[in-house]
């Protein structure tokens, strides 16, 4: 749960070529594509309007992976801020998909049917070989949420967005895997409520 009075603006990184074909990225470092750079610019313009000169009152933090750090750089540039003046936080890295990283989602029912069925049966607790479950991720991200002391703009990943909403909004853990994770919107979380901007 966010400490009282704190607002979190959460942005998922812009699209990558792997996103475009539904390939699991996890903690594999992949660059933004042209669509992703445009999405990041749109989100930066939105935050510039929303924060309207109050950005000095916010902490800026991103996952250290390439696609998130580059998204934050573009956002900050669009806001008229130093593109590199933000913190990198390992707790905000995407869920580690283990042996599924690099695999295309639509291929998994045929290429790994047993694991695909196990994930479908318990998407919150299922853990890929050499990877993390959503339960593991929720513990990691919960530690980050508890550490927030100021209003914050964060750039991270789809899985992280889901567990952030689980913690802050009380979304049922068994349902978080199905939450929408757009790359062209800013999510505002405050006072236990969300708004897509």
Language-model features: where?
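Active-site-proximal alpha-helix that buttresses catalytic centers in soluble enzyme cores
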Residues: 6, 15-81, 132
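Generic beta-sheet signal
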Residues: 8, 58, 147-159
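General small-molecule cofactor/ligand-binding pocket signal
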Residues: 9, 61, 87-89
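Short, well-ordered beta-to-alpha junction loops that form the rim of enzyme active sites
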Residues: 14, 62-65, 91, 156-159
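Short, active-site-adjacent cap segments at secondary-structure transitions
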Residues: 17, 67-69, 94-95, 160-163
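Phosphate-handling substructures
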Residues: 31, 77-140, 190
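Alpha-helix C-terminal capping segments
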Residues: 142-150, 189
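Domain-level recognition of soluble alpha/beta enzyme cores
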Residues: 171-197
